[in-house]
């Protein structure tokens, strides 16, 4: 049924990582890897769009053979261009930071036993105490809350190991966070981003950048400058429509799913995420994302044969 929704034109496909292309154990199925390779071979732009920081996201991209192209990290606060010739294999092309002092103060008051952390652009995390083993892939350095609040950051994180996620959500809702974006995950984990910064805002800016690049290169017929036009795609300078598909499973994916021409929620997603999508695919443990991408590939094959 999903195939009926899929566009025929050239695509930008934004994919969440955890719970979408990776399962809860951090594993990627062979089918998922094969689907991504086939999709890229059909000319689609695949953009990893994740809450992970750079150092945690790059290995995922490399695992599926993405060593060039674009990636959205830190829930939209960082956009990077992967380039094998650049130092570290990437170049940060856009980043948004904010003063974390108010968020740190509010969160540490609301959940005194929680772990507070801030993400430093390209430099891992400063943490109030170490995270549980395996939860934070990037480097972490224990510092005081005062030091955390001393410079702009791309993200503030609050983690409360052992706390029920519903209790955690209530405490966060009542703590007085203002002028920021925030999303709560499957566990008692909170990401706080600069105001107005989401995966969707970063993808919108990226689509505009790609369109401008195409215009400068003289490829007007393939211009991909995106301006939000509802749920029918994103229209470039020349009137050409760039179709966009996004797949995700978390609260931090809701804006991205609404932004995309087709937003697909994983079957394992919370109901609020499903309600924000156009279609719902199978859960991650049944390769729901791969099934959707396979349908896209099959649709483009039929188009090319017609």
What are these regions (language model features)?
Residues 64-67, 75, 176-178, 259-260, ...:
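Short, structured coil segments at secondary-structure junctions
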Residues 32, 57-61, 168, 172, ...:
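Hydrophobic packing residues within well-ordered alpha-helices of enzyme cores
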Residues 94-96, 141-143, 280-284:
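Short acidic-hydrophobic, aromatic-tinged amphipathic segments that line or gate anion-handling sites
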Residues 110-221, 233-247, 251-253:
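Conserved acidic, metal-coordinating active-site core of Asp-based
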Residues 30-133:
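Active-site phosphate-binding/coordination module
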Residues 43-47, 67-69, 155, 242-243, ...:
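Short active-site oxyanion
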Residues 3-4, 8, 12, 29, ...:
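Mg2+-dependent phosphoryl-transfer enzymes with acidic/Ser/Thr/Gly-rich catalytic loops
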């Amino acid at each position: 049924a999903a195939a009926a929704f899929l566009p025929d034109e050239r695509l930008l496909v934004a994919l969440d990582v955890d719970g979408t292309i990776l399962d809860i154990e951090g594993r990627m199925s062979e089918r998922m890897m094969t689907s991504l390779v086939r999709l890229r071979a059909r000319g689609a732009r695949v953009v990893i769009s994740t809450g992970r920081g750079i150092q945690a996201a790059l290995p995922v991209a490399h695992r599926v053979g993405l060593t060039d192209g674009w990636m959205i990290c830190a829930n939209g606060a960082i956009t990077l261009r992967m380039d094998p010739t650049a130092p570290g294999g990437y170049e940060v092309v856009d980043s948004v930071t904010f003063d974390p002092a108010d968020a740190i103060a509010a969160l540490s008051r609301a959940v005194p036993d929680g772990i507070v952390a801030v993400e430093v652009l390209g430099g891992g995390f400063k943490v109030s105490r170490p995270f549980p083993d395996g939860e934070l892939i990037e480097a972490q350095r224990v510092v005081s809350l005062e030091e955390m609040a001393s410079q702009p950051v791309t993200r503030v994180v609050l983690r409360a190991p052992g706390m029920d996620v519903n209790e955690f959500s209530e405490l966060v809702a009542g703590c007085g966070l203002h002028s920021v974006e925030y999303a709560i995950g499957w566990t008692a984990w909170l990401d706080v981003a600069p105001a107005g910064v989401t995966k969707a805002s970063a993808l919108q800016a990226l689509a505009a950048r790609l369109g401008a690049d195409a215009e400068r290169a003289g490829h007007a017929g393939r211009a991909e400058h995106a301006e939000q036009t509802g749920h029918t795609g994103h229209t470039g300078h020349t009137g050409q429509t760039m179709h966009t598909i996004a797949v995700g499973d978390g609260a931090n994916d809701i804006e991205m799913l609404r932004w995309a021409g087709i937003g697909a929620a994983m079957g394992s997603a919370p109901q609020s995420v499903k309600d924000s999508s156009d279609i719902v695919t199978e859960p991650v443990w049944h390769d729901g994302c791969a099934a959707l991408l396979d349908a896209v590939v099959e649709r483009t094959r039929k188009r090319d044969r017609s």
